[in-house]
Curated annotation (Swiss-Prot):
Protein name listed in UniProt: Weak toxin DE-1 homolog 1
Major localization class: secreted
Function: Binds to muscle nicotinic acetylcholine receptor (nAChR) and inhibit acetylcholine from binding to the receptor, thereby impairing neuromuscular transmission.
Organism: Ophiophagus hannah (King cobra)
Subcellular location: Secreted
Length: 83
């Protein structure tokens, strides 16, 4: 009986992932860098660079957004990988 119960516990842990969420660096233009826990379903981090002709701007966060022309986007799926 104990081996069956142990097997059920292990299967539950593996299948449910026990609430694991992605942690990404977050930064809006002209704001300090922080970390954020991504919402459920978002398993990627992004780093977006663009220029407005006077300076280079950087934005970081959760997800992998669609980009506009003349932007550089890097997406990754490891905690805090978007440095």
């Amino acid at each position: 009986m104990k081996p069956v119960l142990l097997t059920l516990v292990v299967v539950t842990i593996v299948c449910l992932d026990l609430g694991y969420t992605r942690i990404c660096l977050k930064q809006e233009p002209f704001q300090p860098e922080t970390t954020t826990t991504c919402p459920e379903g978002e398993d990627a981090c992004y780093n977006l660079f663009w220029s407005d002709h006077s300076e280079i701007k950087i934005e970081m966060g959760c997800g992998c957004p669609k980009t506009e022309p003349y932007t550089n986007l890097y997406c990754c799926k490891i905690d805090s990988c978007n440095k």
